[in-house]
From Swiss-Prot:
GO cellular component terms, A-Z: cytoplasm; endoplasmic reticulum; extracellular space; Golgi apparatus; Golgi membrane; nucleoplasm
Keyword field: ATP-binding, Biomineralization, Calcium, Disulfide bond, Endoplasmic reticulum, Glycoprotein, Golgi apparatus, Kinase, Manganese, Membrane, Metal-binding, Nucleotide-binding, Phosphoprotein, Secreted, Serine/threonine-protein kinase, Signal-anchor, Transferase, Transmembrane, Transmembrane helix
Protein's name according to its UniProt entry: Extracellular serine/threonine protein kinase FAM20C
Annotated disulfide bonds: 357-373, 362-366, 421-495, 496-555
Site-annotated residues for Cleavage: 87-88
Glycan-carrying positions: 96
Enzyme class: transferase
Result when mutating residue 446 to N: Mislocalization of the protein from Golgi apparatus to endoplasmic reticulum
Tissues and organs where the protein is expressed, per its UniProt entry: In the mammary gland, expressed at higher levels in lactating mice than in virgin mice (at protein level). Highly expressed in the tooth. No expression in the dental pulp. At the secretory stage of amelogenesis, it is detected in the matrix of the enamel, in the ameloblasts, and within the cells adjoining the stratum intermedium (a tissue layer analogous to the stellate reticulum seen in the developing molar). Strong expression is observed in maturation stage ameloblasts and throughout the non-cornified layers of the gingival epithelium.
Domain of life: Eukaryota
Natural source organism: Mus musculus (Mouse)
Phylogenetic placement of the source organism: Eukaryota, Metazoa, Chordata, Craniata, Vertebrata
C-alpha cells in the first residue's frame, strides 16, 4: 500500500510539472501572437535581427523606421537579438578566445528593399552572388574631429590633419565587412535577457531600432565590432573608439573569470552593457626594467605596455590593436564578490600587511610568492576590448616566420641564415599580396616597443589573405628603455621592403613638430592610470625610430628606392577619388 501511494505521488508531481511547463509556454507565446495579429500595418511580425552591417551605415536607421513609429524612447535602444548575434555571452572563461561556443555564424544578408510610403513593396532584386554593394552612398560626410585631445596646442590634432592620415579605404561591399547578418533567421528574444538592461519596455516587447538616433544608442563595443572591415580594425575618425576607451575605464563589472591557457594570469571581465574585456593586472612599476638575466619568454607581461601599444599603433596609423584602457580595480567588490570561478575565488587571501591578494592559476607567477596584492584592495591593470567571438567571426592563427626559438640554447633559422627572407617570400601567403609588407609594419611596431614575443599573429578568416594582421598580446613590450633589441629588426634587414605610407609616416614622426615621444605622451595623458609610460621609455621611442629609418636608408642604398619602398599611396589615392 505504501509503494502505491509513493508511485501516485510521483505521477502527481510529474503532471503538475508538465502543466506548469505548458502554462509557461502559453504565457510566453500568446502575447507575441496577439501583437503580430493586431499590427497596424498588417505585416507579419518578425523577431529577427537587423543586419549588423546595415546597422553600421548612416542610412540604416531611416530605412528601418515605419510610418507612425517614434524615433525616441525605448524603441531606439539596440535590438537585443543583434547584441546576441555579435557577441557570445557565455559564462565559459574561454569565451571569445576559443571556439567553445556552439552558436553558428549567420550567412550573408539580403539587402532590404523598402517601398516608398503609400506604395506596395517591390519584389526584391535578383541577387548577384559574386559581388554587390553593401551600403548606399549617403552623400557627402560631415567633417569629424580627429581622435584625441583637441585644441590649438594639440600635437595629435595636427598630426591627424596631415594628408598622410587622410587616405580613404576602398568602397566596402558585403565581402569587405566582418558581419553580414541574415535577417531571415529567427533568434530567441530571451537569449540576451538581463534585468539590468536599460531602457527596457513592457515584458515581451520587441526592440527594433528606429529613427535617426537608433545606431547612436548601440553600446560602443557593438559599434566597434560592426565597424571591422577588410582594411582596418576601426576607422581613423570613429568616435565610438574613444567612447569605448571611456567605457573600459568606467562600466560596471558584473562577472569575472580566469582566461584559460596562457603563461600568466589574465581575467575576462564582463560589463553591465554585455561588453567584455581582458584584464591584465599590474606586476611591475613604471620605472622597473626587465632583469638582464631574464629570457624573453619568461618576462613579465606589463599592463601599461598593452595600453601604450594601442596608442602607438594608432599614431602609426596601423589601427590593428583592439582598444585598451587602464583602470583601478577594487579587488573585493569588482573581482572576488562577482566571480563565479571557484578556482579564482579560493586564491584570495589577506597578506601580513592587511592587503587583499590573489594569484589565480596559470603557468608562470601564479603562487603565493607571486601574488597580486592591492593597496589595500585597489589594483591597477589594463582592459583590452574583446574582438567578436570566434564562433561568430573566426580568426586564423599564423606562425610568425621570424618567430624565436623559445629555447635557452637553440637559435631560430632566421638567426643563422642571412638569406632566410628569400625562402619566406617563396612560401604562401608571403609569395603574393601585401602580407610581407604587413610583417614589416609589425616588425617596426615591435621594435619601437622592444617586444621580442611575437610568436604568432592572427587574421579574420572571412577576408582570406587579402587583409590586415591583428597585433594582439603586446604585454612584453616596453620592458627595457636602456637597451634596443636590434634582432627584432631582422625581417626589415633581410627583406629590405617597406610600405611608402609607413616610411613617410615614420619620417614625419621623426620631425621635431611631430615628435613621436611627445605625441605618445599627449595620447596617453588622458588614460585613467596616467602616466602610462616612464619618461625614459618615451625617449627610447625617438631613439629607436631613428634606428628604423637608418635601416631603411641602408636598404635603399643597397637595392634602390623602387625595390625597397612599395608605393601603396597611389592605390589609396584611387580609392579616395572613386569614393
Amino acid at each position: 500500500m505504501k509503494m502505491i501511494l509513493v508511485r501516485r505521488f510521483r505521477v502527481l508531481i510529474l503532471v503538475v510539472f508538465l502543466l506548469a511547463c505548458a502554462l509557461h509556454i502559453a504565457v510566453d507565446l500568446l502575447p507575441k501572437l496577439d501583437r503580430r495579429a493586431t499590427r497596424s500595418s498588417g505585416e507579419p511580425g518578425c523577431s529577427c535581427a537587423q543586419p549588423a552591417a546595415e546597422a553600421a551605415g548612416p542610412g540604416w536607421a531611416q530605412a528601418r523606421s515605419r510610418p507612425g513609429e517614434s524615433a525616441g524612447g525605448d524603441a531606439g535602444w539596440p535590438n537585443k537579438h543583434t547584441l546576441r548575434i555579435l557577441q557570445d555571452f557565455s559564462s565559459d572563461p574561454a569565451s571569445n578566445l576559443t571556439s567553445h561556443s556552439l552558436e553558428k555564424l549567420p550567412s550573408a544578408a539580403e539587402p532590404v528593399d523598402h517601398a516608398p510610403r503609400g506604395q506596395e513593396p517591390r519584389s526584391p532584386p535578383p541577387r548577384d552572388p559574386a559581388h554587390r554593394p553593401l551600403l548606399r552612398d549617403p552623400g557627402p560626410r560631415p567633417r569629424v574631429p580627429p581622435p584625441g585631445p583637441s585644441g590649438d596646442g594639440s600635437l595629435l590634432a595636427k598630426l591627424f590633419e596631415h594628408p598622410l592620415y587622410q587616405g580613404a579605404v576602398p568602397p566596402l561591399t558585403e565581402d569587405d565587412v566582418l558581419f553580414n547578418v541574415n535577417s531571415d533567421i529567427r533568434f530567441n528574444p530571451k537569449a540576451a535577457e538581463n534585468p539590468d538592461w536599460p531602457h527596457e519596455g513592457a515584458e515581451g516587447a520587441e526592440f527594433l531600432p528606429t529613427g535617426e538616433a537608433a545606431v547612436n544608442l548601440y553600446p560602443n563595443w557593438l559599434k566597434f565590432h560592426i565597424g571591422i572591415n577588410r582594411y582596418e580594425l576601426y576607422s581613423r575618425h570613429n568616435p565610438a573608439i574613444d567612447a569605448l576607451l571611456r567605457d573600459l575605464g568606467s562600466q560596471k563589472i558584473t562577472s569575472v573569470a580566469m582566461k584559460s591557457g596562457g603563461t600568466q594570469l589574465k581575467l575576462i571581465m564582463t560589463f553591465q552593457n554585455y561588453g567584455q574585456a581582458l584584464f591584465k593586472p599590474m606586476k611591475q612599476t613604471r620605472e622597473q626594467e626587465t632583469p638582464p638575466d631574464f629570457f624573453y619568454f619568461s618576462d613579465y607581461e606589463r599592463h601599461n605596455a598593452e595600453i601604450a601599444a594601442f596608442h602607438l599603433d594608432r599614431i602609426l596609423d596601423f589601427r590593428r590593436v583592439p582598444p585598451v584602457a587602464g583602470r583601478m580595480i577594487n579587488m573585493t567588490k569588482e573581482i572576488r564578490d562577482v566571480t563565479r570561478d571557484k578556482k579564482l575565488w579560493r586564491t584570495f587571501f589577506v597578506s601580513p600587511a592587511n592587503n587583499i591578494c590573489f594569484y589565480g592559476e596559470c603557468s608562470y607567477y601564479c603562487s603565493t610568492e607571486h601574488a597580486l596584492c592591492g593597496r589595500p584592495d585597489q589594483i591597477e591593470g589594463s582592459l583590452a576590448a574583446f574582438l567578436p567571438d570566434l564562433s561568430l567571426a573566426k580568426r586564423k592563427t599564423w606562425r610568425n616566420p621570424w618567430r624565436r626559438s623559445y629555447h635557452k640554447r637553440k637559435k631560430a633559422e632566421w638567426e643563422v641564415d642571412p638569406d632566410y627572407c628569400e625562402e619566406v617570400k617563396q612560401t604562401p601567403p608571403y609569395d603574393s599580396g601585401h602580407r610581407i609588407l604587413d610583417i614589416m609594419d609589425m616588425t617596426v611596431f615591435d621594435f619601437l616597443m622592444g617586444n621580442m614575443d611575437r610568436h604568432h599573429y592572427e587574421t579574420f578568416e572571412k577576408f582570406g589573405n587579402e587583409t590586415f594582421i591583428i597585433h594582439l598580446d603586446n604585454g612584453r613590450g616596453f620592458g627595457k628603455y636602456s637597451h634596443d633589441e636590434l634582432s627584432i629588426l631582422a625581417p626589415l634587414h633581410q627583406c629590405c621592403r617597406i610600405r611608402r605610407s609607413t616610411y613617410l609616416r615614420l619620417q614625419l614622426l621623426a620631425k621635431e613638430e611631430h615628435k613621436l615621444s611627445l605625441l605618445m605622451a599627449e595620447s596617453l595623458q588622458h588614460d585613467k592610470v596616467a602616466p602610462v609610460l616612464y619618461q625614459l621609455h618615451l625617449e627610447a621611442l625617438d631613439r629607436r625610430l631613428r634606428i628604423v629609418l637608418q635601416a631603411v636608408r641602408d636598404c635603399v642604398e643597397k637595392d634602390g628606392l623602387s625595390s625597397v619602398v612599395e608605393d601603396d599611396l597611389a592605390t589609396e589615392h584611387r580609392a579616395s577619388t572613386e569614393r
